[in-house]
UniProtKB/Swiss-Prot annotation:
The keyword Cell inner membrane applies. Its EC number is 2.3.1.275. InterPro entries: G3P_acylTferase_PlsY (IPR003811). The lineage of its organism: Bacteria, Pseudomonadati, Pseudomonadota, Alphaproteobacteria, Rickettsiales. It is found in: Cell inner membrane. The chain crosses the membrane at residues 7-27, 52-72, 80-100, 113-133, 147-167. Probably interacts with PlsX. NCBIfam families: glycerol-3-phosphate 1-O-acyltransferase PlsY (TIGR00023). It catalyses: an acyl phosphate + sn-glycerol 3-phosphate = a 1-acyl-sn-glycero-3-phosphate + phosphate. This is Glycerol-3-phosphate acyltransferase. It comes from Ehrlichia ruminantium (strain Welgevonden).
Length: 195
Protein backbone atom coordinates (compact mmCIF):
# COMPACT_ATOMS: atom_id res chain seq x y z
CA UNK A 1 0.00 0.00 0.00
CA UNK A 2 1.28 3.47 -0.90
CA UNK A 3 2.52 5.29 2.22
CA UNK A 4 0.50 8.39 1.34
CA UNK A 5 -2.65 6.25 1.40
CA UNK A 6 -1.71 5.10 4.90
CA UNK A 7 -1.38 8.75 5.95
CA UNK A 8 -4.81 9.60 4.52
CA UNK A 9 -6.42 6.64 6.30
CA UNK A 10 -4.73 7.72 9.54
CA UNK A 11 -6.00 11.28 9.03
CA UNK A 12 -9.53 9.98 8.52
CA UNK A 13 -9.34 7.87 11.69
CA UNK A 14 -7.93 10.76 13.75
CA UNK A 15 -10.53 13.10 12.28
CA UNK A 16 -13.21 10.60 13.27
CA UNK A 17 -12.45 10.94 17.00
CA UNK A 18 -15.76 12.40 18.30
CA UNK A 19 -14.57 14.71 21.04
CA UNK A 20 -17.95 16.39 21.48
CA UNK A 21 -19.59 12.99 21.96
CA UNK A 22 -16.88 11.71 24.32
CA UNK A 23 -16.68 14.85 26.48
CA UNK A 24 -20.47 15.06 26.79
CA UNK A 25 -20.58 11.54 28.17
CA UNK A 26 -17.62 12.16 30.49
CA UNK A 27 -19.31 15.09 32.27
CA UNK A 28 -22.71 13.41 32.37
CA UNK A 29 -24.61 15.19 29.59
CA UNK A 30 -25.18 11.93 27.78
CA UNK A 31 -25.52 11.41 24.04
CA UNK A 32 -25.09 14.86 22.47
CA UNK A 33 -26.61 13.49 19.26
CA UNK A 34 -29.99 13.50 21.00
CA UNK A 35 -29.79 17.25 21.61
CA UNK A 36 -30.39 20.22 19.31
CA UNK A 37 -29.16 19.64 15.78
CA UNK A 38 -28.04 16.11 16.61
CA UNK A 39 -24.44 16.56 15.51
CA UNK A 40 -21.32 16.22 17.63
CA UNK A 41 -19.67 19.58 16.94
CA UNK A 42 -18.92 22.46 19.29
CA UNK A 43 -22.02 24.47 18.33
CA UNK A 44 -24.36 21.69 19.39
CA UNK A 45 -22.36 21.02 22.57
CA UNK A 46 -22.69 24.76 23.28
CA UNK A 47 -26.43 24.31 23.71
CA UNK A 48 -25.77 22.07 26.72
CA UNK A 49 -22.52 23.33 28.19
CA UNK A 50 -20.84 26.48 26.92
CA UNK A 51 -17.46 25.87 28.53
CA UNK A 52 -17.37 22.29 27.29
CA UNK A 53 -18.08 23.60 23.80
CA UNK A 54 -14.84 25.59 23.88
CA UNK A 55 -12.86 22.47 24.79
CA UNK A 56 -14.64 20.57 22.01
CA UNK A 57 -13.74 23.31 19.55
CA UNK A 58 -10.08 23.25 20.57
CA UNK A 59 -9.78 19.46 20.39
CA UNK A 60 -11.60 19.24 17.05
CA UNK A 61 -9.25 21.87 15.66
CA UNK A 62 -6.23 20.15 17.19
CA UNK A 63 -6.96 16.78 15.61
CA UNK A 64 -6.84 18.21 12.09
CA UNK A 65 -3.77 20.29 12.98
CA UNK A 66 -2.05 17.05 14.03
CA UNK A 67 -3.13 15.31 10.83
CA UNK A 68 -1.61 18.01 8.64
CA UNK A 69 1.54 18.02 10.79
CA UNK A 70 1.90 14.26 10.27
CA UNK A 71 1.47 14.69 6.52
CA UNK A 72 4.16 17.36 6.42
CA UNK A 73 6.58 15.23 8.42
CA UNK A 74 6.47 12.49 5.81
CA UNK A 75 5.98 14.50 2.63
CA UNK A 76 7.30 17.90 1.56
CA UNK A 77 4.60 18.46 -1.08
CA UNK A 78 2.12 21.06 0.20
CA UNK A 79 -0.65 19.46 -1.85
CA UNK A 80 -0.51 16.50 0.53
CA UNK A 81 -1.29 18.88 3.40
CA UNK A 82 -4.55 19.89 1.72
CA UNK A 83 -5.46 16.24 1.19
CA UNK A 84 -4.62 15.39 4.80
CA UNK A 85 -6.89 18.21 5.94
CA UNK A 86 -9.66 16.99 3.64
CA UNK A 87 -9.49 13.45 5.02
CA UNK A 88 -9.43 14.69 8.62
CA UNK A 89 -12.50 16.84 7.94
CA UNK A 90 -14.28 13.95 6.21
CA UNK A 91 -13.52 11.85 9.29
CA UNK A 92 -15.06 14.53 11.50
CA UNK A 93 -18.17 14.70 9.32
CA UNK A 94 -18.55 10.96 8.83
CA UNK A 95 -16.82 9.28 11.80
CA UNK A 96 -16.45 5.53 11.53
CA UNK A 97 -16.82 5.28 15.31
CA UNK A 98 -20.33 6.79 15.30
CA UNK A 99 -21.83 5.15 12.22
CA UNK A 100 -20.75 8.06 10.00
CA UNK A 101 -22.85 10.73 11.72
CA UNK A 102 -20.62 13.56 12.94
CA UNK A 103 -20.07 17.29 12.88
CA UNK A 104 -19.94 19.90 10.15
CA UNK A 105 -16.19 20.28 9.81
CA UNK A 106 -15.71 23.92 10.75
CA UNK A 107 -13.38 23.45 13.74
CA UNK A 108 -11.18 20.91 11.91
CA UNK A 109 -11.01 23.31 8.97
CA UNK A 110 -9.71 26.03 11.28
CA UNK A 111 -7.15 23.66 12.78
CA UNK A 112 -5.81 22.63 9.40
CA UNK A 113 -5.66 26.24 8.19
CA UNK A 114 -3.62 27.25 11.24
CA UNK A 115 -0.96 24.76 10.13
CA UNK A 116 -1.17 25.27 6.36
CA UNK A 117 -1.31 29.08 6.39
CA UNK A 118 -1.95 30.96 9.61
CA UNK A 119 -2.81 34.10 7.61
CA UNK A 120 -5.80 32.36 6.05
CA UNK A 121 -6.73 31.01 9.48
CA UNK A 122 -6.68 34.55 10.91
CA UNK A 123 -8.92 35.77 8.07
CA UNK A 124 -11.24 32.80 8.59
CA UNK A 125 -11.55 33.46 12.32
CA UNK A 126 -11.87 37.23 11.89
CA UNK A 127 -14.72 36.96 9.40
CA UNK A 128 -16.40 34.30 11.53
CA UNK A 129 -16.37 36.62 14.54
CA UNK A 130 -17.52 39.67 12.57
CA UNK A 131 -20.34 37.77 10.90
CA UNK A 132 -21.41 36.21 14.19
CA UNK A 133 -21.48 39.55 15.99
CA UNK A 134 -23.71 40.91 13.23
CA UNK A 135 -26.14 38.01 12.88
CA UNK A 136 -25.69 35.63 15.88
CA UNK A 137 -25.94 32.65 13.52
CA UNK A 138 -23.04 30.20 13.94
CA UNK A 139 -24.04 28.43 10.73
CA UNK A 140 -24.02 31.55 8.56
CA UNK A 141 -20.75 32.68 10.14
CA UNK A 142 -19.20 29.31 9.29
CA UNK A 143 -20.39 29.43 5.69
CA UNK A 144 -19.19 32.99 5.13
CA UNK A 145 -15.77 32.41 6.71
CA UNK A 146 -15.34 29.18 4.73
CA UNK A 147 -16.03 31.06 1.49
CA UNK A 148 -13.57 33.80 2.50
CA UNK A 149 -10.90 31.16 3.16
CA UNK A 150 -11.69 29.59 -0.21
CA UNK A 151 -11.17 32.94 -1.92
CA UNK A 152 -7.76 33.35 -0.28
CA UNK A 153 -6.68 29.80 -1.12
CA UNK A 154 -7.77 30.09 -4.76
CA UNK A 155 -5.88 33.38 -5.04
CA UNK A 156 -2.62 32.28 -3.41
CA UNK A 157 -2.22 28.56 -4.06
CA UNK A 158 -1.92 26.16 -7.00
CA UNK A 159 -4.86 24.98 -9.09
CA UNK A 160 -4.68 21.47 -7.62
CA UNK A 161 -4.57 22.78 -4.05
CA UNK A 162 -7.43 25.17 -4.83
CA UNK A 163 -9.52 22.32 -6.23
CA UNK A 164 -8.91 20.21 -3.12
CA UNK A 165 -9.88 23.12 -0.88
CA UNK A 166 -12.95 23.82 -3.02
CA UNK A 167 -14.09 20.24 -2.44
CA UNK A 168 -13.47 20.72 1.29
CA UNK A 169 -15.44 23.98 1.35
CA UNK A 170 -18.34 22.47 -0.60
CA UNK A 171 -18.51 19.55 1.83
CA UNK A 172 -18.68 21.95 4.77
CA UNK A 173 -21.35 24.10 3.15
CA UNK A 174 -23.35 20.99 2.20
CA UNK A 175 -23.24 19.91 5.85
CA UNK A 176 -25.04 23.18 6.62
CA UNK A 177 -27.94 22.49 4.22
CA UNK A 178 -30.50 22.15 7.03
CA UNK A 179 -29.25 25.40 8.58
CA UNK A 180 -29.56 27.20 5.25
CA UNK A 181 -33.14 26.00 4.88
CA UNK A 182 -33.98 27.13 8.42
CA UNK A 183 -32.39 30.54 7.81
CA UNK A 184 -34.48 30.95 4.66
CA UNK A 185 -37.55 29.99 6.68
CA UNK A 186 -36.47 32.34 9.50
CA UNK A 187 -36.51 29.43 11.96
CA UNK A 188 -32.76 29.08 12.60
CA UNK A 189 -31.84 29.55 16.26
CA UNK A 190 -29.47 32.34 17.21
CA UNK A 191 -26.64 31.67 19.66
CA UNK A 192 -26.56 33.34 23.07
CA UNK A 193 -22.96 33.77 24.24
CA UNK A 194 -23.78 34.64 27.85
CA UNK A 195 -22.03 32.18 30.19
Amino acid sequence: MDFQVVIFILCYLIGSIPFGFILSYVIGIGDIRKTGSGNIGATNVFRKNKKLALLTLLLDALKSFICVAIAQKYNIDNTILFLAALFAIIGHMFPVYLFFKGGKGVAPLLGSLIFIDYRVAVCFLTFWIICFLLCKYASLSSIVSTLIALLFICTCYTIVQSVIFTITALLIITQHTDNIIRMLNKSENKINLKL
